[in-house]
Amino acid sequence: MHELSLADVPSRIGQELGKSEWITVDQTTIDLFADATHDHQFIHVHPERAAVESPFGGTIAHGFLTLSLLSAMNFSGMPKIREQTMGLNYGLDRVRFMSPVKTGSRVRGRFVLSECQFRGASMLVTTYEVTVEIENENRPALTANWITIIQFDPNDRPKGI
C-alpha cells in the first residue's frame, strides 16, 4: 500500500485514492452481524424462507453490515497517511443502499477524496465519496459520503496550512 503525507492530501481532491480488496459476505458473517445488532429478520438469517418468501432468491446482507465493512475496506485499499496517529469516524452523509448484497457475494470499496480541511492544530477532516461495488453487478451496493478525522501530532502539521 502506498503512503501519502499530510501536505499531499489537499492536492488529491477529486481523485480516487483507493480501491479495497474484495470481501466475501458469507452467511456466517451475516449471522454474526444479526446477533450483534439483534436484527434477525428472515431475509438475513433464514436461507430457506428467504428463498421462497423474498424477491432476492435467498438471504441478503444487512445494509448496515455492508456499510460497516467500510472500515475494513479503508484499511485494505486506502493509502496510509505518514503522520497519522489515529483515525476516527466523524459521520456519513447521503447514504444510499442501491442494491442488495446476496449471501456469498464479494464487495469492495472505492474512495474518491471530495473534501479536506485542517481543523485545530492536529486534525484533518476528510470527506470521501464512497462506492461499494458488488462483483459482477452493474449497480453498487451503496454510495455514501464518509467523513473521517485524521489525527496527527501538531508538530507534523504542514507549514503554511
Curated annotation (Swiss-Prot):
Domain of life: Bacteria
InterPro entries cross-referenced by the UniProt entry: HotDog_dom_sf, MaoC-like_dom, NodN-like
Keyword Calcium applies: no
Record bears the keyword Electron transport: no
Keywords: Nodulation, Plasmid
CDD domains to which the protein is assigned, alphabetical: NodN
Role played: Involved in the production of the root hair deformation (HAD) factor specifically on medicago.
Name of this protein: Nodulation protein N
Organism per entry: Rhizobium leguminosarum bv. viciae
